[in-house]
Amino acid sequence: MKRLIPLLLAAATLCGCRPAVSDYAIVAGPGIADDPAWSEVVAALRQSHPGAALLSYTEAPDEALPALRELAPRYVAFVDRPEQIGRDYIIALNRMARAVDGDSYDDYLWGVVTGYNAAAARRMVEAAREPLTVRSAVSTLREVGCGKWFDAFAYVDDRTPGLCGEKRPGADSVTHYMTTRTLADGRPDLLRCFCDFYAAYDPDLITTASHATERNLEMPFSVGNLRARDGALYADFPEGPEPLHETGKRRVFLPIGNCLIGNVNRTRESMAVAWMNSAHAAAMMGYVVPTWYGRNGWGGLKYWLTTPGRYTLAEAFYLNRQDMLHWLDYRG
């Protein structure tokens, strides 16, 4: 199974609901409880979820597993500094989620709360007390190019170089066209198109594909990059870097077709942390391994988009994983 990182807030914070006492557990990483700033992140979570159980670990997250088996929570939030979070950490959390009882399915909805610093992590927790309804999107996916789920939408196509589309507020459908923006070598300037769409539509949702690493996000056909520096995203244009235009609104970032971009890589200078910090991503799902075709990502997106309003983002990805696990069990 391809590993996907459910970053930021655990499922209940995205639901806009308050689970019953003991339905929510918080697992604090090494030194979190003793750090005045990071302990405030935990306190903010407990304020959002009264009665939440508080657990901790010192060496490995699975130290909390015996207590989780006893509590049997429905939601678990792991609070850690970026320097603690990497590929192996996420793999361990995926395995833990299936280890509370004896079957092969996930036993709780979970996510990671982190940030460029403690203040950024706390800001996300506090902002998530109000549910986020997605009405607008910017994308680099042909798969969502019809834009039918959104009131406003724009995309850069990842199969036909230079093809773009826009659905302006009030329009019934997407208008497709070939961009006239070009680079000095004649290739379409897809990075400029994407950044202009981002600024103009101020999207609630961003979905992306094409190459990526922990340090960059390529536009389709390798025409330009978004990069991270000092916890902020910028466009790496030939004429010089430009910060990605931000308004401070919360967003959802789903790099469904990108390798590695979900891997925090044990540093706060990663792309994942920059999306949380400067782009105010309130929810993010991303791969921590080299893949662009995993069912964990594409399937979760399909569960969420094809039943609009039925599931929260966290619920959609959770249900997709259970579907995958059932299929794997069935195939033996």
Q: What is each stretch, according to the model?
A:
Residues 2-8:
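Sec-dependent signal peptide recognition
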Residues 9-22:
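Bacterial Sec-dependent signal peptides at the C-terminal "C-region" and cleavage site
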Residues 20-332:
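Cysteine-dependent hydrolase recognition
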